[in-house]
């Protein structure tokens, strides 16, 4: 079962999306702050991160930057911030997608599946190359 870290501080959004993700077969951990997100990320292995931009103690950009220092885990920004500068910043920092709220739930689920599918394909290709002594 694939595991998602959902970083969001709005309780009304957390419950609905977490329920939907779990009903779709994902395990979901939620963090409401940058500090909590980074602690969970260091402690657990995740297949995908969903990040809000605005958090009580910083930004999703802070989480993305810290994660990108040590990991290639897929990251999707899921936020109300639709300013072009935020979108460009998120993608330039290494996010795989940037989705603005309000979003269509089925579209989000399809994007998550597509990103996880690509991530798994790259992981398998990497393992195959390492197994054959090619790197």
Task: Go through each PLM region and give its residues.
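N-terminal/domain-start alpha-helical segments
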Residues: 1-120
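CheY-like receiver
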Residues: 119-135
